[in-house]
């Protein structure tokens, strides 16, 4: 899947403790996480006495300009956020980190992922008199914390975390500490690094640690939270009801290829998936082409395994923001023409294996196939380095309805005809799991593959009724004929 198909990541979070240039380093860290969200960005800083922040709409360079940075320089602690809206509207009021000033403390908080029981929690809180200032589900946890009777902020945080469901990470800043939180399934990643001067870093991906020249310390695991203070770092647990289920889509599409998740480099995983795809679904052709940018690693693996030349038959305009961030399908489709072009002299008269990482709605791959054929390509064999994207995701990906998914209603043969390809094949679920190579004692070896299997490790909660109401016949058939490990509340079947 290209960067233009309408599949969107939720957000990226970053935090740093005890560095004299915390705001500047946070800005750099967020820049390396820009691929995770382009609708807005923000930074909150602290100096043990005061918390203050800046935020704005658009790319990081548009949201936080030099004059904003001058307002937050000189503070030693910071958190930052880049946003793509998976819940809530796209106004400035939803740009994070949120900054709260209470009579007894100030708190900055930002969030990556989606809370699948936020609607019901919000309703209960409003019935108790809570007033919300945004439509983002992140605000829910702050209300839960403030309504807790626990004696300390940390205890109130732990109590509140046990009430929320979904795939999430949080970065939270107070005057005394920096907190990092991971959901009970570790669906969304969070890592810790350390700089030469002793400053600690939290980030959604290791690439944000690497860009600052910091040392990777560890992943934060399922149901864990980290507390960073002037005394050092401590990793604790807020729940022992955990089952590791790391999002497969982080490896397939969302994360940067130079990032490492749970010990597995993203580029290496994608290349391995391309090799496995070639083993499972070879094709006779003159060359292999990948859809820029997230499919290039898989395409190189496919070409290497099958012994075909790997060519640059598609070129991406690197100076246009990623189209998938556009809020309407029409804008996304127009963006494909602006951002991708075929190299006619390479593809003219050739049989091509076109490798993409996924098909979600099918509109983008259809346009790319047409673009290549208009440029003279002969036969086009589409190979997808992931299984059929048949089920919606509720854990922070902007595909939360069955109607958006072409594989929910169409077979591979029907999709092949729809997109104008000469053949179409997908990587198997087992092939994906083995290519990634995790080895947790958990279903799917510790992967969350809900979009391919309809098996939801964190449950469905507020989404259950609508999800079940709109299940297609293909989805029902898949569920009936394949083993599922989790019930609608994310509990393992006994």
UniProtKB/Swiss-Prot annotation:
Pathway: Purine metabolism; IMP biosynthesis via de novo pathway; N(1)-(5-phospho-D-ribosyl)glycinamide from 5-phospho-alpha-D-ribose 1-diphosphate: step 1/2. Its EC number is 2.4.2.14. Residues 1-10 form a propeptide. Gene3D superfamilies: 3.40.50.2020, Glutamine Phosphoribosylpyrophosphate, subunit 1, domain 1. The keyword Ligase does not apply. It is an enzyme of class 2 (transferase). This is Amidophosphoribosyltransferase. It comes from Staphylococcus epidermidis (strain ATCC 35984 / DSM 28319 / BCRC 17069 / CCUG 31568 / BM 3577 / RP62A).
């Amino acid at each position: 899947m290209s960067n233009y198909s309408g599949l969107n990541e939720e957000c990226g979070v970053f935090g740093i403790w005890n560095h004299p240039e915390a705001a500047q380093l946070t800005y750099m860290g967020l820049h390396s996480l820009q691929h995770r969200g382009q609708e807005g960005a923000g930074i909150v800083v602290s100096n043990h006495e005061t918390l203050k922040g800046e935020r704005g709409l658009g790319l990081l360079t548009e949201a936080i300009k030099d004059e904003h940075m001058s307002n937050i320089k000189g503070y030693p602690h910071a958190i930052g956020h880049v946003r793509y809206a998976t819940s809530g509207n796209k106004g400035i009021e939803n740009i994070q980190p949120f900054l709260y000033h209470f009579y007894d403390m100030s708190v900055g908080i930002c969030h990556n992922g989606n809370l699948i029981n936020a609607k019901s929690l919000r309703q209960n809180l409003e019935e108790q008199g809570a007033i919300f200032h945004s439509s983002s589900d992140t605000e829910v946890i702050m209300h839960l914390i403030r309504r807790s009777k626990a004696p300390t902020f940390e205890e109130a945080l732990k109590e509140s975390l046990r009430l929320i469901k979904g795939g999430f990470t949080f970065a939270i800043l107070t005057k005394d500490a920096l907190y990092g939180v991971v959901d009970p399934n570790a669906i969304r990643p969070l890592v810790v690094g350390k700089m030469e001067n002793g400053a600690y870093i939290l980030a959604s991906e290791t690439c944000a640690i690497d860009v600052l020249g910091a040392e990777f310390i560890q992943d934060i695991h399922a149901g864990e939270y980290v507390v960073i203070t002037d005394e050092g770092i401590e990793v604790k647990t807020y729940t022992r009801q955990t089952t590791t289920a790391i999002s497969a889509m982080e490896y397939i599409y969302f994360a940067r290829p130079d990032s490492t998740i749970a010990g597995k480099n993203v580029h290496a995983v994608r290349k391995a998936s391309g090799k496995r795809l070639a083993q499972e679904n070879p094709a006779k052709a003159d060359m292999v082409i990948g859809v820029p940018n997230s499919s290039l690693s898989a395409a190189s693996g496919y070409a290497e395994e099958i012994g075909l030349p790997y060519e640059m038959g598609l070129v991406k305009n690197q100076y246009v923001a990623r189209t998938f961030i556009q809020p309407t399908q029409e804008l996304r489709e127009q963006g494909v023409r602006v951002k991708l072009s075929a190299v006619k002299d390479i593809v003219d008269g050739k049989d091509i294996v076109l490798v993409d990482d996924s098909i979600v709605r099918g509109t983008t791959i259809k346009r790319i196939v047409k673009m290549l054929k208009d440029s003279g390509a002969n036969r086009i064999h589409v190979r997808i380095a992931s299984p059929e994207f048949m089920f919606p995701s509720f854990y922070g990906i902007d595909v939360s309805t069955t109607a958006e998914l072409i594989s929910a209603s169409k077979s591979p043969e029907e999709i092949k005809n729809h997109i104008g390809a000469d053949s179409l094949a997908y990587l198997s679920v087992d092939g994906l799991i083995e290519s990634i190579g995790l080895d947790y004692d958990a279903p799917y070896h510790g992967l969350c593959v809900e979009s391919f299997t309809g098996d939801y490790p964190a449950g469905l909660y507020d989404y259950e009724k609508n999800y079940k109401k709109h299940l297609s016949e293909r989805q029902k058939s898949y569920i009936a004929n394949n083993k599922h490990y989790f019930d609608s509340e994310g509990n393992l079947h006994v």
